[in-house]
Amino acid sequence: MAASPARPAVLALTGLALLLLLCWGPGGISGNKLKLMLQKREAPVPTKTKVAVDENKAKEFLGSLKRQKRQLWDRTRPEVQQWYQQFLYMGFDEAKFEDDITYWLNRDRNGHEYYGDYYQRHYDEDSAIGPRSPYGFRHGASVNYDDY
């Protein structure tokens, strides 16, 4: 089918009409849209928020709160009393008991202590697969250097 000579002219006019509609449509006359989007908008000055209690009363209330000093362990618990009696029976004094209690309570909190459990995991260092994490500890030598 041969194209009629009017068809390209109709397509050109339709394209021109679409272009004009896009340019003169809503917001098209008011200027550059990108410039308008990037332009700062005028915002009203924020008003001071209303609070139920005035500042002096709030500070007075918060200043009166006192936190009790927390014990390392609860001496009222029967198992702690039993540990204490066992330590005294074995010949340790209270200072030694407190040292040991703080050691065992803090042992899991810092996992990076050199002579703690972190480095002293004994794998066969010549095994084919090695430990699961290659960055966790040294392996591959025939000697476990952490034992020296």
From Swiss-Prot:
* UniProt subcellular location: Secreted; Cytoplasm; Apical cell membrane
Alphabetized UniProt keyword annotations: Cell membrane, Cleavage on pair of basic residues, Cytoplasm, Membrane, Secreted, Signal
Q: What is its main location?
A: secreted
**Pfam families from the entry?**
Augurin
Which residues are assigned to the propeptide feature? Answer: 32-68, 133-148
Nuclease as UniProt keyword: no
For this record, the Gene Ontology CC terms, alphabetical, are: apical plasma membrane; cytoplasm; extracellular space
> In what tissue types does this protein appear?
Expressed in the brain, with expression in the epithelial cell layer of the choroid plexus (at protein level).
Highest taxon above the source species: Eukaryota
Q: Name one GO biological process term.
A: cellular senescence
Residues making up the signal peptide according to the UniProt record: 1-31
Q: Which family does it belong to?
A: Belongs to the augurin family.
Q: What does this protein do?
A: Probable hormone that may attenuate cell proliferation and induce senescence of oligodendrocyte and neural precursor cells in the central nervous system. ECRG4-induced senescence is characterized by G1 arrest, RB1 dephosphorylation and accelerated CCND1 and CCND3 proteasomal degradation.
Task: Indicate what this protein is called per its UniProt record.
Answer: Augurin
Q: Which organism is it from?
A: Homo sapiens (Human)
